[in-house]
Amino acid sequence: RKNHPNPKLGELTLDTVLSHYRQVLKGLDEKPILVGHSMGGLIVQILLAEGLGAAGIAIDSAPPKGVISLKYSFLKSNWPVISPSAKVSEPFFPTQQNFDYSFSNCIPAAEQKSAYERFAVPESRRVGKAPTEDVAKINFQTARPPLLLIAGSLDHIIPASLNRSN
């Protein structure tokens, strides 16, 4: 973590991540149950739509293209990544304040600093902005395997209302 953010993380795209998982899944003898959280939930939805899983569970899933939220908590939590003025080529590393609001909002304030020090990691802004791009488009009219969407009522990054829209 002390060496982060690695500038190469700024080059990572959702398409690159999806390509990796497609390769892994196509090499399996049978289709697995896919499980993902946040951006991983969106990845589960995309891979299921492509027929690469037997079923899926998406926990507080990032939204596919066209599913949006204007809820304050969503905008505040995600703005450092999705802001038009944010440099997509630079990885995002949350500040303590951003981490407290976005990730550790359900734990006691006394524990937030240690949670930040243990769990805060940089992320690719390109991946974070991907739900607004065609790579994250899902045709909801196409049949796909069963998908369970789970929403956290206190989640600031992906509010439950956004999961219901999804």
Where are these regions (language model features)?
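Active-site nucleophile elbow and catalytic-triad environment of alpha/beta-hydrolase enzymes
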Residues: 121-140, 144-145
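Conserved alpha/beta-hydrolase catalytic His-Asp/Glu region
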Residues: 92-127
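Short beta-strand/loop motif that positions the catalytic acidic residue
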Residues: 143, 149-151, 155
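Short beta-strand immediately N-terminal to the catalytic nucleophile in serine-hydrolase-like folds
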Residues: 34-36, 59, 150
